[in-house]
A protein has these predicted regions:
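Active-site entrance/lid segments in N-terminal catalytic domains of soluble metabolic enzymes
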Residues: 1-217
Length: 217
């Protein structure tokens, strides 16, 4: 992909969303029976190479169980609504309605953002983390719990105590080395991975080089 000049000494490459990408067959095709899609993380085997994103609009305990039945996995976020509310069904329905109202012009974006902040201001409950892990495990699926880098240290003890199978460190943009002015202590991924027995996945990197850097930790 050609690089584009974006400033003095700086360049970048055009990024594409999934909606803009089409997969076309090559000149040589292969019978489906001869294709192997299974993969493995530590001792955990999956039939399809898919882990559903740890977003409240994507992954729930029920989604994780169903994904496990289909051969994949789904990461439930320890800071999501499922670990803040006993039953977030009504809250999720309200969020969907807020989106509908904004699209139709019935409410503004400012009001929607403010209500979302109120909804997510509910405190994460450690007992709910343990219950979601147990719920997914009882459903027969591999338990995958996600947490943001900023909250990893504060929630780690509760997550480890719940005994998930996989831990995902998930951020909008995640790197192996974070520079700060010292006001906030950054998460040391290398140290974290080495002191945990649970396999750790890190998500939120947008390039091949960033992925390699993370894997070297």
């Amino acid at each position: 992909v050609a690089e584009i000049e974006i400033g003095i000494g700086k360049s970048g490459r055009r990024g594409y969303s999934l909606d803009e990408v089409a997969i076309s067959p090559s000149r040589r095709t292969r019978d489906a029976d001869e294709v192997e899609t299974s993969w493995q993380i530590d001792a955990y085997q999956f039939e399809i190479p898919v882990i559903a994103a740890p977003l409240d609009g994507v992954s729930s305990p029920a989604t994780a169980i169903e994904m496990g039945r289909l051969g994949g996995a789904a990461a439930v976020h320890a800071e999501g609504l499922w670990c803040r509310y006993e039953d977030p069904t009504d809250v999720l329905a309200e969020i969907a309605e807020l989106t509908t109202q904004r699209v139709s012009g019935q409410s503004g974006e400012t009001e929607q953002i403010e209500r979302m902040r109120q909804i997510y201001s509910a405190v994460v409950q450690p007992d709910l983390i343990a219950r979601r892990v147990a719920q997914i495990r009882d459903g027969g699926a591999t338990v995958c719990i996600a947490v943001t880098p900023a909250s990893t240290e504060s929630l780690l003890a509760h997550i480890v105590r719940a005994e998930p199978d996989l831990l995902v460190i998930h951020g909008t943009v995640t790197s192996a080395e974070h520079l700060t002015d010292g006001a906030h202590e950054p998460l040391d991924l290398k140290h974290l991975v080495r002191r945990l027995e649970v396999p750790v996945l890190v998500g939120g990197c947008a390039s091949y080089q960033a992925a390699l850097h993370l894997m070297r930790t």
